[in-house]
């Protein structure tokens, strides 16, 4: 475990108290060449709302988002907000980005509740204000508030049709956190306990987002917790960070996110990194599944594949889906051959441990789709956030139906897949020209192949099989005719697919071409 940065400068900074008049970490990064100075001119794409409007939006942010994204200290943020609307207005680029990100997030929530395109455009206008200030942060602003600002605008983009900026912004936030040293325990005596706690909190928010996004996409995380670890801010239990479940139980959502992020880091390290042991995959999978089960017992004891779950706080629903996605990623590692090999053995001929892994994948996929059915249709940003998780569930259930079409649960599974395809179709029609168009093509083709396999197992002639997705029945007759008669000409290139969307095939799927070759 790292005990601190190795440079001589860092050793001096840790042992020398800060004095007024000395250079601060902020001032070291201020130099720029005159040719690029115009880039840092403050650009206002959309004027800020009135004081009343801004106060209302910021208050809503801390009421609805703070539990899942406790990146800011509410009293301090409100104090800066008051200064923004007074003669003491700060010119900090980090504050400008943070404020507009908070306004954008809160305004988007209003827009979704009202189903108003005009209100949504206003949210994007505030987001453009925030983006206009990111250059200044990335090139000239190295302080804690800069990390907070990057995380805030990244949080906005996570729930959009293009999550690519969120990957880059979170990565930059982690690197900026490294540059100011919040990835290690500070030895600076001038840092107050409150500031030290906030530094820990911001660090762990960056880690939670980094680990979550990387596990979804198969990319390596920006920070290795084995190389730099800071104890979580366990004493942070103020009531603004407590979430109540529908059953009345109280939960610190942030603490549960931290513990899951630690497990997610172990998943990548033990199963996917160059450090992963090559010959003991079964032991690693068993250990990771036990860690996930321990997490579930502590933070989500009612979350089982046979339990009835109700719609919870959006942060809690996201946490549940992240948990099930982690179960899939871990279990899939032990049963990969079954999912992707064209010469797979029969399910009954597999070792019991591999059969258990397959069942884990199936149960988690069913739970993911059941949870998705509870999400209100107005939560569009939430739906965009979980596209890759839903796609993983669809891929697993469809492959299982292709592999074992006589499975007694196959019909119900395909009904659930149809529900997800309807969600995809609704989102794609609302926005269009997004990576979801390609996701739909992949999922719909697997869906049709699964239906064909199920109907063929009943000894129906191939010519008489109708493989049009029920989720697409409201399409025009021309589209239905095309789906029936041109499916055999569809070709799928996974490499080309990944180049057209921000997410690769979920969980690093490397599907062999046999799954995509024509069958009808």
Swiss-Prot record:
<protein>
    <recommendedName>
        <fullName>Fusaridione A cluster transcription factor fsdR</fullName>
    </recommendedName>
</protein>
<dbReference type="InterPro" id="IPR007219">
    <property type="entry name" value="Transcription_factor_dom_fun"/>
</dbReference>
<dbReference type="GO" id="GO:0006351">
    <property type="term" value="P:DNA-templated transcription"/>
</dbReference>
<dbReference type="InterPro" id="IPR050987">
    <property type="entry name" value="AtrR-like"/>
</dbReference>
<dbReference type="GO" id="GO:0003677">
    <property type="term" value="F:DNA binding"/>
</dbReference>
<comment type="function">
    <text>Transcription factor that regulates the expression of the gene cluster that mediates the biosynthesis of fusaridione A.</text>
</comment>
<keyword id="KW-0539">Nucleus</keyword>
<dbReference type="Pfam" id="PF04082">
    <property type="entry name" value="Fungal_trans"/>
</dbReference>
<feature type="region of interest" description="Disordered">
    <location>
        <begin position="1"/>
        <end position="30"/>
    </location>
</feature>
<dbReference type="GO" id="GO:0008270">
    <property type="term" value="F:zinc ion binding"/>
</dbReference>
<dbReference type="GO" id="GO:0003700">
    <property type="term" value="F:DNA-binding transcription factor activity"/>
</dbReference>
<dbReference type="GO" id="GO:0005634">
    <property type="term" value="C:nucleus"/>
</dbReference>
């Amino acid at each position: 475990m790292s005990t601190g940065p190795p440079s001589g400068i860092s050793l001096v900074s840790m042992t020398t108290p800060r004095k007024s008049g000395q250079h601060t970490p902020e001032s070291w990064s201020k130099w720029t060449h005159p040719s690029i100075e115009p880039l840092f001119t403050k650009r206002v794409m959309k004027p800020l709302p009135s004081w009343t409007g801004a106060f209302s939006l910021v208050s809503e942010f801390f009421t609805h988002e703070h539990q899942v994204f406790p990146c800011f200290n509410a009293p301090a943020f409100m104090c800066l907000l008051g200064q923004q609307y007074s003669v003491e207005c700060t010119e900090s680029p980090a504050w400008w980005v943070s404020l507009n990100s908070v306004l954008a997030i809160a305004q988007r929530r209003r827009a979704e509740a009202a189903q108003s395109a005009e209100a949504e455009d206003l949210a994007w206008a505030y987001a453009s204000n925030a983006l206009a200030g990111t250059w200044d942060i990335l090139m000239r602003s190295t302080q804690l508030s800069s990390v907070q600002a990057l995380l805030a605008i990244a949080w906005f983009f996570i729930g959009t049709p293009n999550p690519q900026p969120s990957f880059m912004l979170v990565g930059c936030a982690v690197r900026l956190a490294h540059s100011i040293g919040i990835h290690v325990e500070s030895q600076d005596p001038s840092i107050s306990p409150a500031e030290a706690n906030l530094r820990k909190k911001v660090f762990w928010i960056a880690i939670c987002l980094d680990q979550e996004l990387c596990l979804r996409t198969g990319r390596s995380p920006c920070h290795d917790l084995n190389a730099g670890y800071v104890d979580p801010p366990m004493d942070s239990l103020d009531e603004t960070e407590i979430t109540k479940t529908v059953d009345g139980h109280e939960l610190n959502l942030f603490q549960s996110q931290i513990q899951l992020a630690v497990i997610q880091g172990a998943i990548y390290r033990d199963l996917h990194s160059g450090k992963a042991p090559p010959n003991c995959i079964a032991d690693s999978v068993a250990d990771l599944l036990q860690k996930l089960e321990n997490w579930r017992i502590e933070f989500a004891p009612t979350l089982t594949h046979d339990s009835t779950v109700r719609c919870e706080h959006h942060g809690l629903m996201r946490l549940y889906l992240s948990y099930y996605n982690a179960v899939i990623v871990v279990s899939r590692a032990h049963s990969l051959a079954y999912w992707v090999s064209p010469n797979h053995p029969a399910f009954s001929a597999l070792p019991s441990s591999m059969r258990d892994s397959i069942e884990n994948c199936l149960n988690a996929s069913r739970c993911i789709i059941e949870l998705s059915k509870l999400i209100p249709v107005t939560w569009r940003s939430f739906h965009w956030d979980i596209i890759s998780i839903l796609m993983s569930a669809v891929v697993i259930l469809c492959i299982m139906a292709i592999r074992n079409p006589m499975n007694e649960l196959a019909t119900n599974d395909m009904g659930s897949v149809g529900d997800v395809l309807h969600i995809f179709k609704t989102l794609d029609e609302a926005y269009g020209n997004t990576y979801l168009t390609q996701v739909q093509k992949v999922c719909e083709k697997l869906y049709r192949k699964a239906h064909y396999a199920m109907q063929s197992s009943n000894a129906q002639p191939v010519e008489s099989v109708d493989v049009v997705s029920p989720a697409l029945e409201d399409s025009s007759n021309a589209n239905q005719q095309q789906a029936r008669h041109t499916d055999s000409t569809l070709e799928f290139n996974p490499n080309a697919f990944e180049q057209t969307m921000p997410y690769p095939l979920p969980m690093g799927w490397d599907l062999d071409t046999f799954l995509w070759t024509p069958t009808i």
